Amino acid sequence: MTRYKATIAYDGTDFAGFQSQTNQRTVQKEIEKILTKLNSFEPVILQGSGRTDSGVHAFGQVIHFDLKGKVRDLERLRFGLDTQTPADIAVKKVELVPDDWHARYQKHEKTYEYYLENSITRSPFQRHSKAYFRYPLNFERMQEAMSKLVGEHDFTGFTASGSSVDDKVRTIYQAEIIRLDEENFKFIFRGNGFLYKQVRNMVGTVIKIGNDRMPVSQIDKILTSKNRDFAGPTAAPEGLYLKEVKYAENTDI
């Protein structure tokens, strides 16, 4: 068996998330169908760097999988996967990795981006690719709130109640908001890991602060109290993208 690492992109609109689920269309199941075909119909189970929820997209999700036989030509394998997967999945790169390399458990950092349209009327052409908020937002307040998220914190207060992870301490290296134009914002979060719905809960809270319905100091209160009830609503999934996964062998993490 030979282990391969692949970088993939997908439009999450019509998926029930990344991870396999019974009677649901998922990214993992669609790719595994093609991998099994390429593996002489012997089942292949892939592993991802992490899950994304229904409606969430990815520019750079990373997976690994094992195929029997000799080492494949990497570009031919990438091309074979890319042309046989559905139109809402793209296989960007395939690499050879050691047999013990693991997409989830290798030390890595992740970058998420969140795109928000802020206008009186919503663009129908962006309804699957950006979230929407029609009310006024104070950019400076949102910048200040985002800066408070940087560093090592216990993010229990920004985690969905369904999280099964015991250790909720994570480090955020970058939390930034960029005004793309008069009607569009981009949020950037880069860290050593993120909890279930953490990014969307942070965005929902910052939006509420930007709309003057919470003080900037609410971020401190949420982090200190570890109480989800003090945070804002969970932001919509369509604005969220897994931008990049960087592993320790090619970064300074």
UniProtKB/Swiss-Prot annotation:
This is tRNA pseudouridine synthase A. Homodimer. Formation of pseudouridine at positions 38, 39 and 40 in the anticodon stem and loop of transfer RNAs. GO terms for biological process: tRNA pseudouridine synthesis. It comes from Lactococcus lactis subsp. lactis (strain IL1403) (Streptococcus lactis). It catalyses: uridine(38/39/40) in tRNA = pseudouridine(38/39/40) in tRNA. The keyword Cytoplasm does not apply. Keywords: Isomerase, tRNA processing. GO terms for molecular function: RNA binding; tRNA pseudouridine(38-40) synthase activity. The keyword DNA repair does not apply. The gene is truA. It comes from the Bacteria.
